[in-house]
Curated annotation (Swiss-Prot):
Keywords: Cytoplasm, Initiation factor, Protein biosynthesis
Protein name, as recorded: Translation initiation factor IF-3
GO CC terms: cytosol; membrane
Main localization (coarse): cytoplasm
Biological function: IF-3 binds to the 30S ribosomal subunit and shifts the equilibrium between 70S ribosomes and their 50S and 30S subunits in favor of the free subunits, thus enhancing the availability of 30S subunits on which protein synthesis initiation begins.
Similarity section: Belongs to the IF-3 family.
NCBIfam families: infC
Segments forming a coiled coil: none
Recorded name of the encoding gene: infC
Organism: Campylobacter lari (strain RM2100 / D67 / ATCC BAA-1060)
Localization per record: Cytoplasm
Gene Ontology terms for molecular function: ribosome binding; translation initiation factor activity
Length: 173
């Protein structure tokens, strides 16, 4: 069973009186549901309840198959417009050499140019847990290297055994 609410069609409509609208926008006014069903059958279309909460309920005479197709088409378009955020993670340690930092920053800048978010994670081992400031200092050093091409989304923050910082590509003006 689908998640969307079911739409009442033709004989499923139990209301005595309904407000009826034609496929072309013509307003039939408040008529009995039987009369609206007769009009829909004469036109070879369906009677679809579009506003069951209204008093009286609002029904429209239309081609239900075409209506469903249009709804699915709108949903597909909306889904296409959604942007999936891709986060790349770069792991570091407190005792990383400068050359390795340069290499990791180069990769991070490539990811940022592709429009991806980059999460830097500094792993704290053993006694390093006692001074997470070293991890924060390393992330601040990295931030100075990427600040011209990125915005800092999340400040360096200790989470468990990691010090994390999230950077995002700069917004184009």
């Amino acid at each position: 069973m689908s998640k969307e609410k079911e739409v009442l069609l033709n004989d499923e409509i139990q209301a005595d009186e309904i407000r009826c609208i034609g496929d072309d926008g013509k307003v039939y006014g408040i008529i009995s549901s039987d009369e609206a069903l007769d009009i829909a059958n004469r036109l070879g279309l369906d009677l679809v309840m579009i506003a069951p909460e209204a008093k009286p309920p609002v029904c429209k005479i239309m081609d239900y198959g075409k209506f469903r197709y249009q709804q699915e088409k709108k949903q597909k378009e909306a889904k296409k417009k959604q942007k999936v955020i891709d986060i790349k993670e770069i792991k570091l340690s407190v005792k990383i050499a400068q050359n390795d930092i340069n290499y990791k920053v180069k990769h991070a800048s490539e990811f940022l140019e592709q429009g991806k978010h980059v999460k830097f994670r500094v792993f704290l081992k053993g006694r390093e847990m006692g001074s997470p400031e070293a991890g924060v200092a390393l992330l601040e050093k990295i931030w100075q290297m990427v600040e011209d091409i990125a915005d800092r989304d999340k400040e360096p923050l200790l989470e468990g055994r990691y010090v994390n910082m999230l950077v995002t590509p700069k917004k184009k003006k």
